[in-house]
Amino acid sequence: MQVQSLEVTTGKSSEIEIADGVFGVPYNEALLHQVVVAQMAGMRSANAVQKNRAAVRGGGRKPWKQKGTGRARAGSIRSPIWRGGGRAFPGGNENYTQKVNKKMWAGAMRTVLAELLRQGRLQIIQQEDFGEPRSRLGRDWLSRAGGDNVLLVMGEVPLNLFLGLRNFPRVGIAGWQDVGPADLLQYGRVLLDVEAAARLGEVYG
C-alpha cells in the first residue's frame, strides 16, 4: 500500500510503499487485549514479601504444656492465629508472566500498527539526525513533527537525535525491535521511520 512519508525538517513528503499484510490488516481487539495484558504483566516485579510462621522471629518454645491448664493447646506463639504470628498463606515470589506465542505477538503487532495508521496516529517519516545533541534542536524538531506525546520508532536510533530528545518527558525513542503493542499504544502518536517500517514489514508480514 502507498502512504505519505514526511521529511520533518523540510516539511516535504513523498509516497512510499509499505507492507499491506502488516499495515492493512483488520482490527482484532481480543488478540490485542490479550497480548497487551501479557506484556504489561511481564513488567511487574513481585516485590511484596510476607513471612510464614517459620520465617517470623521467635516461637520456638511451646507456650504452655499440652494438657492440664484448661487453655487451648498451642505449640508456638508465631502461629497464624496468634497476634504477631506468621501468615498462613504468605505472598511473595509470584510469577506474573503469561505465555504469548510468536504468532500471537506478530498478530497483535500487525493489528496495532494497522489500527494506528487508520486512526491517523501513525506517521511514516524519513530518517533524520541533528547536527549536534541539543534539546533546543529537539524542541524545534518536535514542533515541526506535531508536538510531544509521541513515540519515535527507528531502524537505527541516531545518537544526536536520541540525546536531543531524551529530556522531554512525553517523548519515547526506541529501535523497531524493542517495541511491543503496549508501547505503541502508550503514546498519542507514533512516528515510524522508513527503515523501521520496512523491517517491521519484513518480520511481521
From Swiss-Prot:
Gene Ontology molecular function: any one: rRNA binding
SUPFAM superfamilies, per the entry: Ribosomal protein L4
GO terms (BP aspect): translation
Protein's UniProt keywords contain RNA-binding: yes
InterPro entries assigned to the protein according to its UniProt record, in alphabetical order: Ribosomal_uL4, Ribosomal_uL4-like, Ribosomal_uL4_dom_sf
Keywords carried by this UniProt record: Ribonucleoprotein, Ribosomal protein, RNA-binding, rRNA-binding
Region (Disordered): 53-77
Protein family (similarity comment): Belongs to the universal ribosomal protein uL4 family.
Protein name per Swiss-Prot or TrEMBL: Large ribosomal subunit protein uL4
